[in-house]
Amino acid sequence: MKTFLVTAFILLFITLFVISESYPCTFFYAATKKSVLFGNNKDWISTESYVWFCPPEKGGYGRILFGFEFFPGQKEPSSGVNDQGLVFDLGWTSNKERTGALTGETFKGNIFDKILEECSSVDQVLELLKKYNNLQVQYTYLVIMFGDKHGNSLIVDRGQVRAKTTRFQIVPDDSKAAEPCTQYQIAHSLLSSADEISIDLFKRILASTHVEASRATTAYSTICDLKNGKLYIYYFHNFMEEVVLDINEELTKGYRTLELGSLFPPSVAEKDFRWLKNRELEEKKEKSLAKTKSREAFEHISGTFVNSFDPEDSVVIGFENDKLYITSADKSKVELYPESLTKFFIPLANGDWNLTFAKGESKNSSTLVAEHEFLGMKMRYERIK
């Protein structure tokens, strides 16, 4: 699983996100002659979010990325901004049918990181998307927004591109829905009635559209001042605590990854939410362990499997002290928990991986299908030994 995540995103993330139709992420862009701002609420099932800083190198642009860890040691961006004033964010859509024509080749890697590294404007993003078909092949269940400091933005939804036609754009884009969702209604009302756009206005919109629920919460929020290169960060829907970063200044400090919560004072609400989610994980494990059979019953899944899409991506499944583990090509290792003789899961804070094994002609399982419970990621692995 060198790319349990990268390959997954080759069929997918991150991000980020619609947990269900009840909790869509909210992000929006607005531009006037004076200001160009972007804001987002990242609604998710976990607060274990990260920010990583990638300084410019080899002619590429520097960028700051936000995201989650969907497999131990493997983080994927769900939003980000570069030092040229280009920003992106993504969310889930319930309609996964592709409507755009399929063109171009598939880029093996994270297309969003590549866009921020190579593009400085929405026009350049469009040119790159003509070359690569990732958004049409892998991301049909994502709605993605790109915006630049020049006043241009667009939404890519199931392969279709919608450019900004007024001074702002909003996701979820429910402008044609019979009953627009609450987040859209609030954001649209505040943006359309404002004489000027400002950081205070965007903060007000984020505060009014954030989510607090046992299932999902607003893990983090950001406002990007694209003309002035400033980044405003809020953690766990607390808009009283604000971290302001100068994008160019931060990128001079070198490459680094931080847990987003480390930038903020401790929060009782966040601690309680994290405790609740950890308890849910432990309960899942306990239920699974109650089904555990003898080691011999699971011997048929031991072995090495290679990804059908990417031969460099392989996983090894084996026993240690009578416990089953799956190890990726980069040596990340996690325990497998049984649901039956052929179905297993990996309980993680950012969503479980469900693994299904199928037997071939021999007594051993010949194929493995790994699927993320929320993200729609599905990968097929074939046994090689």
Task: State what each model feature region is.
Residues 126-129, 203-206, 302:
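A generic alpha-helix structural signal
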Residues 8-18:
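Bacterial N-terminal signal peptides
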Residues 28-31, 224-226, 319, 357-361:
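Short, low-complexity Ser/Thr-rich regulatory SLiMs
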Residues 124-140:
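Secretory/export targeting leaders with adjacent low-complexity proregions
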